[in-house]
């Protein structure tokens, strides 16, 4: 089995401010977290875990044969939850790379996850994250994040504003991160930064502290479910696509 030194962790907290019991909302006959897990599981990696504070979520995943790690409800961010889960993986001294896949992307493509892993292993970046080329009309919503990169694909800045200003085509940031273990350990030890708090983007903590984030280009923007409107969009996509 490939990538024995990689763990994929899906943080999934039951409480959500904008969509009640978000991970357990149905898209067709399956819950949101089920769909995320099934997509991630298609990578065929051995070390795939859902990190949660909820027995209900754990039961859903365990019925699918998945592995669950319980984490505290009060952990502030998905990345912090990812690290807490990583520390509880048996024999984690053999894990050198950790991929954080957000638990709100029910149609995330396994190919995108594998591309992040390959690019991380084949580079010297601390972190690798996927981006998608999109037109201006596709990224107007405030919940969407764009990224400016240098000529080699290294991230310069992330923003909820459209960057670079005046462009017609942008790089949409997909909320998934591949970390070297040392980078994840360093991240959680750092205090939140000014830009991070201003933009409400935790990846800016990395940039403000001199860490490097590489980007890898993927084909499709995955639907992220944060609001009732997002859930409706996901249900319509599911029905149109005739997914199982």
Swiss-Prot record:
Gene Ontology MF terms in the entry: 3-deoxy-manno-octulosonate cytidylyltransferase activity
Location(s), subcellular: Cytoplasm
UniProt pathway: Nucleotide-sugar biosynthesis; CMP-3-deoxy-D-manno-octulosonate biosynthesis; CMP-3-deoxy-D-manno-octulosonate from 3-deoxy-D-manno-octulosonate and CTP: step 1/1; Bacterial outer membrane biogenesis; lipopolysaccharide biosynthesis
Catalytic activity: 3-deoxy-alpha-D-manno-oct-2-ulosonate + CTP = CMP-3-deoxy-beta-D-manno-octulosonate + diphosphate
A GO CC annotation given for this chain: cytosol
Gene3D superfamilies recorded: Spore Coat Polysaccharide Biosynthesis Protein SpsA, Chain A (3.90.550.10)
Keywords (A to Z) from UniProt: Cytoplasm, Lipopolysaccharide biosynthesis, Nucleotidyltransferase, Transferase
PANTHER family in the cross-refs: 3-DEOXY-MANNO-OCTULOSONATE CYTIDYLYLTRANSFERASE, 3-DEOXY-MANNO-OCTULOSONATE CYTIDYLYLTRANSFERASE, MITOCHONDRIAL
Homology family: Belongs to the KdsB family.
Function: Activates KDO (a required 8-carbon sugar) for incorporation into bacterial lipopolysaccharide in Gram-negative bacteria.
NCBIfam families assigned to the protein according to its UniProt record, in alphabetical order: kdsB, PRK05450.1-1, PRK05450.1-5
Name of this chain's protein: 3-deoxy-manno-octulosonate cytidylyltransferase
Designated gene of the protein: kdsB
């Amino acid at each position: 089995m490939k990538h024995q030194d990689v763990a994929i962790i899906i943080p999934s907290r039951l409480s959500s401010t904008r969509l009640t019991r978000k991970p357990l909302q149905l898209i067709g006959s399956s819950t949101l977290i089920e769909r995320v897990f099934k997509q991630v599981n298609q990578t065929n990696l051995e070390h795939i875990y859902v990190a949660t504070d909820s027995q209900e979520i754990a039961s859903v995943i365990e019925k699918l044969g998945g592995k669950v790690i319980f984490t505290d409800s009060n952990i502030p961010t998905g990345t912090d939850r990812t690290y807490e889960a990583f520390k509880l993986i048996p024999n984690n001294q053999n894990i050198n790379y950790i991929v954080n896949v957000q638990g709100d992307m029910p149609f995330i493509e396994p190919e995108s996850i594998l591309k992040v892993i390959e690019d991380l292993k084949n580079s010297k970046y601390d972190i690798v994250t996927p981006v998608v080329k999109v037109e201006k009309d596709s990224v107007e919503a405030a919940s969407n994040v764009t990224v400016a990169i240098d000529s080699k694909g290294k991230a310069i800045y992330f923003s909820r504003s459209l960057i670079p200003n005046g462009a017609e085509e942008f790089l949409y940031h997909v909320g998934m991160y591949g970390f070297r273990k040392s980078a994840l350990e360093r991240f959680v030890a750092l205090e939140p930064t000014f830009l991070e708090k201003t933009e409400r983007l935790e990846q800016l903590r990395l940039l403000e502290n001199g860490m490097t984030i590489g980007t890898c280009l993927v084909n499709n923007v995955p639907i992220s479910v944060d609001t009732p409107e997002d859930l409706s969009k996901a249900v319509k996509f599911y029905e149109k696509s005739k997914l199982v």
